[in-house]
Amino acid sequence: MCKYCYVCGKSGNLEAHHICKRSQVPALTHCTLNIVYLCPIHHRSEKGIHGRDGHELDLKLKLEFQNKLELLFDKEYFTEEEIRETLGISDRAAKRLLKTLKRKNNMFERSDIIRSCMGGRLYGDS
């Protein structure tokens, strides 16, 4: 599968970027929904997401990820298995993601799931 820089479309010499930092949401470290590929310029330069001027790009990616989660989690409550399958994560990662969330009839509320995936906060008006 050929990968391209999310920003400029260049291929080759790409770096994986976690939209929500691994330190914020360790459970999503291997979740492909939380990863985009960036060229070194858009990843590490001053204009890159980790650079001095990267805040807007970072916010844009977070909003897009949040919107994607809102589309995927399209009902009010989900089981742990449904969450795991939707995110494509392991049992252990799912338990880690959900351990602080309240259960209702052994199910988790949509807004709590999305907030947890986003590192504990929601961004903008989605």
PLM segments and residue spans:
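Helix-turn-helix DNA-binding helix
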Residues: 94-95
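Short cysteine-rich loop/turn motifs with clustered Cys
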Residues: 1-15, 39-41
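Polybasic, low-complexity binding patches
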Residues: 23-34, 44-87
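Cys/His-rich zinc-coordinating "finger/knuckle" motifs
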Residues: 12-16, 46-49
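Helix N-cap / beta->alpha transition motif
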Residues: 39, 79, 109-110
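Short recognition patches in nucleic-acid-associated and regulatory proteins
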Residues: 13-27
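Short Lys/Arg-enriched helix C-cap and helix-to-coil transition segments
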Residues: 99, 103-126
